[in-house]
């Protein structure tokens, strides 16, 4: 396979620092050079996530969790783009481009990133999602244009479905039952050195030749098994 002279995209998606690197570097490489990736459909994820995010718009930060500093959620669902990423003193062609869920503005002038999750996955922990949140923080503190925002907190706001529960009728719901949730806020500690190391790994992977498939990549394993059937 001949590698194109220029990649199909020059911005890094924050989620590729979690799911991309940890799943399959070959699929990651194909995405950036050929814009070739498997499209996944999750019909319920977006409406559930939108409902969660809308609920906390303009909310006090301490309504999300008492440990957070005084402040208000003032921004949500906005794209952020970083300046070109510098690795080992060399400015690369790559920038981070992503969209955060909620951004709280603290009274001390700093901001807090809140990533919303409606899930029951064992991966809903700070360590797994830290690179993705760090990518948003990097873009806010090193923007492609405009003023930087210092980030003083990052965290996951997790809703886990807890079955059907009684609710009140309202302009949004016509019956008296709905899905209940248990809410949990998970603070995510910043680790800039680890984040820059992951960025270097990702950029090195993309800029190199096509890597091997990930051993547990469902897409690659399916394609290999399908080819081995030798069906016309």
Model-identified regions with their sequence ranges:
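Metal-dependent nuclease catalytic regions and adjoining charged, substrate-binding loops involved
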Residues: 1-16, 143-232
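Metal-dependent nuclease catalytic cores that hydrolyze phosphodiester bonds in DNA/RNA
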Residues: 1-110
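Short, conserved loop/turn and helix-capping segments at secondary-structure boundaries
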Residues: 50, 126-131
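Hydrophobic, Leu/Ile/Phe/Ala-enriched alpha-helical segments that form helix-helix packing faces
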Residues: 59-64, 140, 144, 206
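Short beta-strand-loop-alpha-helix junction that forms the active-site gateway
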Residues: 116-126
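An active-site-proximal "capping" alpha-helix that borders the catalytic cofactor pocket
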Residues: 130-142
């Amino acid at each position: 396979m001949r590698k194109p002279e220029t990649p199909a995209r020059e911005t890094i998606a924050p989620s590729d620092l979690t799911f991309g690197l940890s799943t399959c570097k070959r699929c990651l490489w194909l995405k950036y050079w050929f814009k070739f990736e498997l499209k996944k459909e999750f019909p319920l994820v977006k409406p559930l996530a939108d409902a969660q995010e809308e609920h906390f718009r303009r909310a006090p930060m301490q309504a999300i969790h008492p440990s957070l500093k005084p402040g208000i959620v003032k921004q949500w669902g906005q794209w952020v783009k970083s300046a070109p990423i510098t690795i080992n003193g060399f400015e690369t062609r790559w920038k981070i481009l992503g969209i955060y869920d909620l951004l709280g503005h603290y009274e001390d002038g700093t901001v807090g990133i809140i990533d919303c999750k409606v899930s029951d996955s064992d991966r809903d922990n700070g360590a797994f999602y830290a690179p993705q949140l760090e990518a948003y923080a990097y873009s806010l503190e090193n923007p492609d244009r405009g003023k930087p925002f210092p980030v003083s907190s990052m965290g996951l706001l997790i809703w886990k479905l807890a079955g059907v529960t009684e609710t009140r009728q309202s302009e949004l719901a016509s019956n008296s039952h709905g899905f209940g949730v248990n809410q949990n806020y998970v603070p995510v500690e910043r680790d800039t050195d680890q984040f820059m190391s992951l960025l270097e790994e990702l950029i090195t992977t993309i800029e190199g030749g096509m890597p091997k498939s990930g051993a547990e990549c469902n897409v690659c394993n399916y394609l290999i098994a399908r080819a081995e059937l030798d069906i016309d």
